[in-house]
Amino acid sequence: TKPGYINAAFRSSKNNEAYFFINDKYVLLDYAPGSSRDKVLYGPTPVRDGFKSLNQTIFGSYGIDCSFDTENNEAFIFYENFCALIDYAPHSKKDKIILGPKKIADVFPFFEGTVFESGIDAAYRSTRGKEVYLFKGDQYARIDYGSNSMVNKEIKSISSGYPCFRNTIFESGADAAFASHKTNEVYFFKDDHYARVKVTPGGKLAIMDGVREIVDYWPSLKDIVPL
């Protein structure tokens, strides 16, 4: 990620809200899926101030470079080779750490000895069970955080699993991603561009409006990115 651009994002349990992480700060958006009516609800503010439980952690000091939502008000957050499971307690100051911070390989032992052990670039929650897709460079893996296992036990290239990304900037990787509240839609971000992708588990993948510049279609981020 270039400094000042979106490092990580995750979908909130609150409808049409998502958290975006930039440098050591974050912003809470109503991202108004499929429209340009998105607006800032909170921020940009330092992670350590908005999430008091992270104040004395690596995430409070340096920020969050990957994240994905799980159940209820919970999410996994990452920074370099560390991760934690948090209750982010939307619209309250009651956030807490449930697990960690621990090394990625300690929480997800199947990543030991793989490219994901040293850090994860982007991730999004699938609509299938407790599955999540994680990205590192031009590779991706599918995991099940319920059974804590890698699905199919293989790491694949983005170009093979996401043919819609061939010959785009996303073929070589993504900086951030999050699953929309609209079923089977995912947003991917890289530097000053984004793509909205239709993802049908086991089915076809398609970029919905092409790869676009964030500044043209996200009025809420226009004055924030780059931060």
Curated annotation (Swiss-Prot):
Pfam families: Hemopexin
Binding residue positions for spermine: 118
Residue sites binding Ca(2+) per the record: 7, 65, 121, 175
GO cellular component terms listed in the entry, alphabetical order: cytosol
Keywords noted in UniProt: Calcium, Cytoplasm, Metal-binding, Repeat, Seed storage protein, Storage protein
One MF term in the entry's GO annotations: heme binding
Subcellular localization(s) per the UniProt record: Cytoplasm, Cytosol
Stretches forming Hemopexin repeats: 3-46, 61-111, 117-165, 171-221
SUPFAM superfamilies: Hemopexin-like domain
Main subcellular localisation: cytoplasm
Primary role: May play a role in response to oxidative stress and polyamine biosynthesis. The monomeric form binds one hemin per monomer. In the dimeric form, about half of the dimers bind one molecule of spermine each under physiological conditions. Ligand binding is mutually exclusive as binding of hemin leads to dissociation of the dimer.
Subunit structure: Monomer and homodimer. Dimers are prevalent in solution.
Entry protein name: Albumin-2
High-level lineage: Eukaryota, Viridiplantae, Streptophyta, Embryophyta, Tracheophyta
